[in-house]
Amino acid sequence: KNYILDKNERILKKNNTFLKITEKEIDFIEILNSSTKPLSKDFILKNIWNYSTDTDTHTVETHIYRLRQKIKDKFKDSNFIKNSKKGYSL
């Protein structure tokens, strides 16, 4: 999608547009980008937040919503993070 992730500056870039992102958002983008298949909410909770999969939380959904909004507002891209029955992917 022509995005560049600068972890040191905590910036997501596309063309000449920059978006400041948090460490968790970087972790989230990296884990999704490293996978060839969609990742489940439980997998993301365990690997990014170290939460038990028994925990009832909306952490993943909340972070996805916020990151999608930031990317949509800045880059006009509403399909950066996709979700399906199998999980989330880039």
Where are each of the predicted segments found?
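A structural micro-motif at secondary-structure boundaries
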Residues: 2-27, 89-90
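Positively charged, aromatic-enriched patches within helix-turn-helix-type DNA-binding elements
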Residues: 16-85
